[in-house]
Amino acid sequence: MATKFNASVPQLSRSQLIDVLCSEYATKRSVIIEGPTGTGKTQIGRDVAARLGFPLVYFDCNVKGIEDLTCPQFVTINGVEVVRSVPHEEFGLQFDQPIVLMFDEVAKNRSLIPGITRVLLERTIGSVPLHPKTVIFGTTNLGAENFGDVVPGFVMSRVALIGMKNPTVDEMLQYGAATGWDAALLAAIHEMPGLIDCFTNVEKPEDNPYIYDPRDSSRRSFSCPRSLHNLSDLLHERQYLGDDVVMNMAMGIVGAAAAKHIMNLVTLGDTLPKFKEIVADPKGVKAPDSAGARIISALMCLQRVEAENFSPIFTYIKRLPMEVQALFANQLMKTPTKAVWVSRQADFTEFARKNFALFTQ
């Protein structure tokens, strides 16, 4: 949906941005990534550093000053004592190796912007050039979020400013399944995509009560990928903390509107067969009969299935409606650690052959 917030804003997905930062282009020109709060911009630095094998230098502009870029050093040149600026040790220039230099919240600290701009453009700190293979980029929140993040025009002409798309439901399911998110929470994301939407896609604040919206100052807690990850960690402690504590904390993490709907699915998950029960009796265990319960069960199986128990799990999954089978099969193939072995499972390859259309959607 086109709104006054998102017209003509160039955007790339998170994976596309990582590809850009891992390319030769990023060793010549600097990039500033602008995206909604809580969508994983900071994690990009870790992912780029891991792919390239370079150390990550994380520079948090919220808490840094211009003095954290360089320090004065007294030297004598031609018999004259002068002062020169030398980079702080944390930048690792003394090791003569490329780094991934990330300026997080780059537009937050106005007094720091002139100093950072020189690094972004000239790729030097003080008078010391960075390694020619160094990758430099910054991140910032959307200016429309009213957090004080505004990239000045004189900076925009010196860098590539690009927006980051919100993650899709598919991307969130993949990430959550790979990192052990609560299955009922993943089902909530699948059933309520609005939990991870951005206000720039919403005409009126009341159209999506779950997310941050600068037009509604009453939303102190809200749903976004970061707060949902926080909630997942809490849900893993539900048995110990109890529902009353978890519900109240959930409202403080993702807001009352999101917490209510998510906790309904969490409670529904209590009625489902346990993983070990499915493995022990995949044909006889009671299968869920509601759409939400089926999705929770399938996503729970997706998280825990391994090569040695795949056969009984898949027997159970095939008792569920085709759309749930498709969800399970597609997400399984998109999980790198599981796709390796599932492609060698005879019953899965036969299923894929008969239902080829499910994998081309």
Model-derived segments and spans:
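C-terminal regulatory/interaction module of P-loop NTP-utilizing enzymes
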Residues: 2-361
